[in-house]
Amino acid sequence: MKDEKPLILVTNDDGILAPGIRALISVMETIGDVVVVAPDKPQSAMGHAITINNTLFLDKISKDDDTITEYSCSGTPVDCVKLAVNEILKRKPDLCVSGINHGSNSSINVIYSGTMSAAVEAGIEGIQAIGFSLLDFDWNADFEPAKAFVKKITLETLKNKLPPGVVLNVNFPKLSEKEIKGIKVCRQAKAYYAQKFDKRQTPFGKDYYWLTGKFTNEDNGEDTDEWALENGYISVVPVQFDLTAHHTMQQLNTWKLNG
C-alpha cells in the first residue's frame, strides 16, 4: 500500500488570481494533495485581521473533476485558514503554505504581513506552516527561480517537522536561480518604517491621506534576514507566536505592582 500523500493547504494575501500563488500551487501539486483557499481580492498588509462584523462568502471556483480544489473567500488571509480548517477540509492538513508574496516580508514586515499571518494562524491550529515571499512587487514578477527552493524547504519541513508554536518565514532575493548563493537560517533584522502621510483633498474640500514611508534597517548583523537577502541568499527565519517577553519577567517582578 502506497503512503498517503500529504494534504497541503495553500493560501496568500495577494488574492487567488495572483501569479505568486499560482507558482506556489504548481510546486505543491508535485508534493501532495492540494486545497486552495485564498482571498477573492488583494488583502496585503492585513496582518492577523479577522472578519467579525460582516458576513463571509466562500465560492468554489474549481470543477469537481479538477485535480486541485480551489475556493475564493471574501475575507482576510486568516479568515481563509480558519474556514479551510474548520469548514472545508475533512482532516487537518499536514502543511499550510502561504504566498508566494509579491514583495518582502522580511524584518518588521512580518508584523504587517497577511501572508505570514495566514501561516501563523495555521501554526496556532497545530499545523506545520511556511510563508514564502519574493522581493519583487511587480505583478509580472518571475517566480521560476524560487520554485526549486520552495520545494526543497517544503519537503524538509514535512520530513523534519517544526516544533509547536513555530512557523517559517522564507524570503527570496530578486535573482536568477544561478545567482542565488544558497539558503541561510537567520534572525529577524531590527528595522522600522519612517512613516509619512501624503495629505490631499477631495473636490469637496475633505482631507484624505495616503500612507507612504521609507524602510530603514538599523541592523547590519550578518545573521539577519536583511543581510542575507542583500547578499544573495534566501532567508529562513523561524517565527514564534508566543509574544511573551520572557527575559523581562524577572525585572517586572521587582516592581512594586502589588503594594
Swiss-Prot record:
Compartment list: Cytoplasm
InterPro entries from the UniProt entry: SurE (IPR030048), SurE-like_Pase/nucleotidase (IPR002828), SurE-like_sf (IPR036523)
Catalytic activity: a ribonucleoside 5'-phosphate + H2O = a ribonucleoside + phosphate
SUPFAM superfamilies noted in UniProt: SurE-like (SSF64167)
GO terms of molecular function: 5'-nucleotidase activity; metal ion binding; nucleotide binding
Gene Ontology cellular-component annotations: cytoplasm
Cofactor entry: a divalent metal cation
Keywords: Cytoplasm, Hydrolase, Metal-binding, Nucleotide-binding
Residues annotated for a divalent metal cation binding in this entry: D13, D14, S44, N101
Cofactor note (record): Binds 1 divalent metal cation per subunit.
The enzyme's E.C. designation: 3.1.3.5
Broadest EC class assigned to this enzyme: hydrolase
Primary role: Nucleotidase that shows phosphatase activity on nucleoside 5'-monophosphates.
Family designation: Belongs to the SurE nucleotidase family.
Record protein name field: 5'-nucleotidase SurE
Natural source organism: Flavobacterium johnsoniae (strain ATCC 17061 / DSM 2064 / JCM 8514 / BCRC 14874 / CCUG 350202 / NBRC 14942 / NCIMB 11054 / UW101) (Cytophaga johnsonae)
Gene: surE
